[in-house]
Amino acid sequence: MDYGLKNLGNTCYMNSIIQCIRYTGLLSLDDDDFIQNCIKTEKRNEFGLMREWLRLQKSFIIENDTKCVNPIDFYKSFAQNISRSEYTFVGFEQNDAGEFITILFDLLHKCLKYKIKLSVQGDIKNNLDRIAVDSIDYWKKFFENEYSYLIQSTYSQLLSITSCPKCDYSTRNHDPIQIITLHMKPQFETIYDMLSHYTSVETLDSDNSWKCDKCKENVNPEKKIVFWNLSDILIIQIKRYDSNLKKIDRHIGFPILLNMNKFCMNYAEQSMTYKLCSISVQSGSLNGGHYYAICNTDIDNKWKVFNDSNVFDIDFSDMMQQKPYCLFYKRI
């Protein structure tokens, strides 16, 4: 059912993100991996948050004459969990949608987390194999004691390579990433331009200079970031505010089918093609803006606007002219 969500007073940013998540299929009642994780950890109830999330998901599939779901119980549980956590959140005041994604996923992850054993199979035959072993070691460090369906589905792995410009010495580091944050520049026209810049070689300044362990020279090292592995769900956030908090309100081209081959090492040889499921759009300014979602519905393959309780069709051409703040892609 393509139901809207009631605005409870400046909750448009939360409503927008929940609709975007919903149309990826993530954390849904139809997702067997999610349900199995819920069963495995059902005794862990973070102040009712997972229970209220499941009830909210059920509300989306029950016949409702108003065509609108009231998320009050879930938002109350979310606020209670925030009050017991280390997060600073302003309740039902205007907040950042990207911040809401991070906190929501972390709180739900705490409901789902469990221990997992990670091990390396096979022999190391080349440098890529060595990097793969290192990546698993880093993954164990971050997640072996707190793994979950959400880690599996939404966390990618970055590989940063810092190298000496005077010899072939380099160091590597792996980091998990859940939201890919891309910065706008005047010359960028598409998301591909932004991703190319994100993964380009950067010469570090004198504040970050170091003495090379191999040639012993003091150098300004070169740093390059690539994706080592990519998650099934990709969340891309476009930073639309400059250092003075002025909104950069211009269109950036975004594809329906996103090809990440150019930006990922893809050691696991997975598909690097992603389909756009939903976008979150912010109109207005940072402090006085309004969020709404545009999602690709499963049944009729139409694009629809979810503006709080209002739901209506949007032409494909109009959707492609939107200026999204967050984009949700799913591996195909």
Where are the model-predicted features located?
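Exposed substrate/partner-binding surface patches
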Residues: 1, 21-25, 30-44, 136, ...
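Beta-sheet entry/capping signal
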Residues: 11, 161-163, 233, 292
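Conserved S/T- and glycine-rich ATP-binding loop of Class I adenylate-forming
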Residues: 104, 164, 212
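Intrinsically disordered, low-complexity regulatory segments in eukaryotic proteins
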Residues: 124-142
